[in-house]
């Protein structure tokens, strides 16, 4: 038989075992978000094209899934979650007392070339802290992003930077906003050859060298002292360094690297930025930072905000085999008899209400074939329901690992 249809390129089907792992990790991350007081929200899968395109960045704009609805309105599938969350905030939440702590788990779409860790439908899980400009807010988001990964037992590296450091230099060099955006995009793509050419063209050799010196700053918190010496004549850059130092005062984990080469691919970040890398598989598993102008750009009052998103699929690629034991029970009526089946249903219902995972043999298999099925599916226990045993108020419980069988009273089943 020829299968007529295949899943679209860049998408995936998830088998039950994979879904069990994904739900386990999702719930472990939710635990941490909710311990920090974040509340879950969800936005539509598609938004107006204008909203999505406004501050997304040139590279991602090229990857949008865009369509016109029956009313001729131009729509786009969401490529990330921050812009939709800001739209949601402006529509529904702007009058609430600040700060607002929000989190989401949602599928996003980009027409990317499918490869390891990159899919056309992928999942983001993240948090947004809206309405607080204090360094403590940035630190909270950093702590939260790290705590979530610690809670799932992931080994990772955190790199923290600040866009204000480079911005302060570029402003003093009279670089236009358009030129700055191009510089940031080249940095984000790590296209340093073209960056050198472009900076030399617009600034000259000496200024280009200073910018490259800044981008190479990487290490422990102490590198900021050296950076201050180099940038002491750049007041706005010094403000950014001081802001970063204040943020780091409140970061409770010392597992981070200062990295001034982080630019982030989205156009809305304004201050502290960070990226988290896994130790294997797809490398970057999380990114975030401060975006104080985005809400105003979308027509709201000036409102500070900071947030992050995990690449959920990339997290899954970095996780070793999870030991998620869920003991399921198969109930087998020994023959296709209505009364036996009804009794089996009553037993199944009782066990499910006691919190057990129970399946009923519904194919009408003979006992031996039903046991073979149980073995192939990995059931550790089966309950065999026979007429004789039922008349005594009992059933046979078989341990599929040891082969041991014993009669147990129906009233005792919830305790076995």
Curated annotation (Swiss-Prot):
Q: Which InterPro entries match?
A: aa-tRNA-synth_II, aa-tRNA-synth_II/BPL/LPL, Anticodon-bd, Anticodon-bd_dom_sf, His-tRNA-ligase, HisRS-like_core, HisRS/HisZ, HisZ
Write down the Pfam families for this protein, in alphabetical order. Answer: HGTP_anticodon (PF03129), tRNA-synt_His (PF13393)
UniProt keywords, alphabetically: Aminoacyl-tRNA synthetase, ATP-binding, Cytoplasm, Ligase, Nucleotide-binding, Protein biosynthesis
Write down the Gene3D superfamilies for this protein, in alphabetical order.
Anticodon-binding domain, Bira Bifunctional Protein, Domain 2
UniProt GO BP: histidyl-tRNA aminoacylation; L-histidine biosynthetic process
Location(s), subcellular: Cytoplasm
Query: Which reaction does this chain catalyze?
Result: tRNA(His) + L-histidine + ATP = L-histidyl-tRNA(His) + AMP + diphosphate + H(+)
> What is the superkingdom listed in this entry's lineage?
Archaea
* E.C. number: 6.1.1.21
Q: Name one GO cellular component term.
A: cytoplasm
A single MF term (Gene Ontology): histidine-tRNA ligase activity
Family the entry assigns: Belongs to the class-II aminoacyl-tRNA synthetase family.
Instruction: Give the HAMAP family listed for this entry.
Output: His_tRNA_synth, HisZ
> NCBIfam families from the xrefs?
hisS, hisZ_biosyn_reg
Q: What is the official name of this protein in its record?
A: Histidine--tRNA ligase
| Organism name | Methanocaldococcus jannaschii (strain ATCC 43067 / DSM 2661 / JAL-1 / JCM 10045 / NBRC 100440) (Methanococcus jannaschii)
Q: What is the lineage of its organism?
A: Archaea, Methanobacteriati, Methanobacteriota, Methanomada group, Methanococci
């Amino acid at each position: 038989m020829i299968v007529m249809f295949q899943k679209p390129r860049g998408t995936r089907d998830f088998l039950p075992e994979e879904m069990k792992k994904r739900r386990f990790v999702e719930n472990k991350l939710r635990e941490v978000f909710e311990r920090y007081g974040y509340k879950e929200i969800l936005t539509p899968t598609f938004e107006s094209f204008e909203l999505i395109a406004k501050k997304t960045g040139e590279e991602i704009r090229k990857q949008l899934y865009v369509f016109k609805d029956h009313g001729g309105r131009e729509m786009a599938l969401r490529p990330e979650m921050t812009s939709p969350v800001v739209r949601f905030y402006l529509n529904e939440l702007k009058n609430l007392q600040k700060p607002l702590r929000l989190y989401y788990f949602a599928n996003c779409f980009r027409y990317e070339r499918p490869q390891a860790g990159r899919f056309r439908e992928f999942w983001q899980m993240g948090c947004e802290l809206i309405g607080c400009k204090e360094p403590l807010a940035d630190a909270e988001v950093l702590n939260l992003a790290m705590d979530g990964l610690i809670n799932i037992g992931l080994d990772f590296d955190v790199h923290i930077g600040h866009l204000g450091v480079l911005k302060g230099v570029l402003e003093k060099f009279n670089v236009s906003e358009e030129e700055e955006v191009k510089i940031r995009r080249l940095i984000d793509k790590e296209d340093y050859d073209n960056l050198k050419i472009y900076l030399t063209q617009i600034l000259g050799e000496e200024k280009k060298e200073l910018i490259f010196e800044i981008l190479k700053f990487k290490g422990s918190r102490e590198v900021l002292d050296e950076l201050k010496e180099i940038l002491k004549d750049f007041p706005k850059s010094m403000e950014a360094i001081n802001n970063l130092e204040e943020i780091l005062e409140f970061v409770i984990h010392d597992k981070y690297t200062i990295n001034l080469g982080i630019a982030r691919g989205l156009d809305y970040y304004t201050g502290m930025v960070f990226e988290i890398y896994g130790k294997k598989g797809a490398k970057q598993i999380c990114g975030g930072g401060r975006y104080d102008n985005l809400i105003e750009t979308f027509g709201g009052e000036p409102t500070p905000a900071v947030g992050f998103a995990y690449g959920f699929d990339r997290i899954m690629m970095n996780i070793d085999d999870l030991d998620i034991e869920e003991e399921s029970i198969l109930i087998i009526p020994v023959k296709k008899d209505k009364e036996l089946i009804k009794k089996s249903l009553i037993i199944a219902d009782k066990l499910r209400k006691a919190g057990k995972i129970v399946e009923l043999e519904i194919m009408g298999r003979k006992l031996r074939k039903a046991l073979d099925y149980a073995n192939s599916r990995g059931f550790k226990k089966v309950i065999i329901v026979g007429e004789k045993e039922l008349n005594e108020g009992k059933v046979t419980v078989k341990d599929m690992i040891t082969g041991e069988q014993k009669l147990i009273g129906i009233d005792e089943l919830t305790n076995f």
